[in-house]
Amino acid sequence: MLSNLSKSLLSKGKFINKNNLLKNKRSFGTIVPGDKFEWNDPLSLESLLTEEEVMIRDQVNKFCQDELMPRIQMAYRDEKFDREIMREYGKMGMLGATIPAYGGVSHVAYGLMANAVEKVDSGYRSAMSVQSSLVMHPINTFGTDAQKSKYLDGLASGDLVGCFGLTEPNAGSDPAGMQTRAVKNSAGNYVLNGTKTWITNSPIADVFVVWAKVENGDIRGFVLEKGMKGLSAPKIEGKLSLRASITGMIVMEDVEVPPTAMFPEVKGLRGPFSCLNKARYGIGWGSLGAAEFCYSTARQYGLDRKQFGKPLAANQLYQKKLADMATEISLGLQACYQVGRLIDAGKATPERISLIKRNSCGKSLDIARQSRDMLGGNGIADEYHVIRHAANLETVNTYEGTHDIHALILGRAITGIPSF
């Protein structure tokens, strides 16, 4: 039936062709018999993707399941990251993929890559996104032609590994409070002193993008190289999260570099924040990949496991939990998709990226915890993987801006009043 509003508009001649409109009742929400609800794609994200995006998603998913999934259980147990994975990413074209010279794929395609990798492990996705968003992006965007020529090809192939140094022991959510200094000496070179911490990839890095305050207080970016005198990157041991990602510090003790090591134009927090927004966007997609794995695992477990003479999935509460998971994942993916399209159209804002980063990470952590509970005692066994995802997501919900910091970013945008 036509709505009263539609009938009113028709009677007033507001539609061009009344007869065609009456025939085309699908315009008014009629369910087409051929349409089908898919438990793993409730809102048909698939229908929004281009052919190229579907192809990229399928190829990367296959690579992740065939090459990464068989290694993750022991990598997590042993707290070991396989350096060769970076070269494998390079061969797949997954590093710096949105940069025109290294693939030029859409941001939705990049998000699908991050999603596929994090279905396996958040640490594996961290290694990829740091290289792409926090190292290649600033060199490509802010670097000189010489810096681009020297580093980008090697980073894109995975022959070089990069890291990004912003967070410090006393400057986490407040990066403007950084204590790392770059002081010009009599020879005209910069001498860097300071410590960065919780740095993904630093112990194996060849290229270090670090941010420091120069003498006038401006924050400037520098590109350092492994082997420079006074530069070290000790590993942080004993993590109970992201164990398959290598994490360390960057220690700079009188590291002397020429002015050509500095990004020439960008000043202040605009530089590092542009990198963080790139990374946060990928995290929005990626964390939902971990949630999808946990949801799928809980669903299958509920269908297979029988208690009291019937599958766990036959219970109302179990189904309600699965319905909640499916709802949050599908809504979250639609939001990530929309922001990806906005980025490609040049219309994304930091607040929109904060919204999806905060929503995806918070909801994914809740889903992983719930999945762990639904598996009962098996939920803590690493062969089921959900406890690993839950532990990882505790970190993903924290880094690149904590859940609460993103709430404050949104609060400032909503009210116009900064609270930090």
UniProtKB/Swiss-Prot annotation:
Its cofactor is FAD. Substrate binds at R125, S126, S173, F273, S274, C275, L276, N277, R280. PROSITE patterns: ACYL_COA_DH_1, ACYL_COA_DH_2. It is found in: Mitochondrion matrix. It catalyses: glutaryl-CoA + oxidized [electron-transfer flavoprotein] + 2 H(+) = (2E)-butenoyl-CoA + reduced [electron-transfer flavoprotein] + CO2. It comes from Dictyostelium discoideum. FAD binds at F164, G165, L166, T167, S173, W198, I199, T200, T402, F420. This is Glutaryl-CoA dehydrogenase, mitochondrial. Coiled coil: none annotated. Keywords: FAD, Flavoprotein, Mitochondrion, Oxidoreductase, Transit peptide. CDD domains: GCD. The active site is at E400. The keyword Glycoprotein does not apply. InterPro entries: Acyl-CoA_DH_CS (IPR006089), Acyl-CoA_Oxase/DH_mid-dom (IPR006091), Acyl-CoA_Oxase/DH_mid-dom_sf (IPR046373), AcylCo_DH-like_C (IPR036250), AcylCo_DH/oxidase_C (IPR009075), AcylCoA_DH/ox_N (IPR013786), AcylCoA_DH/ox_N_sf (IPR037069), AcylCoA_DH/oxidase_NM_dom_sf (IPR009100).
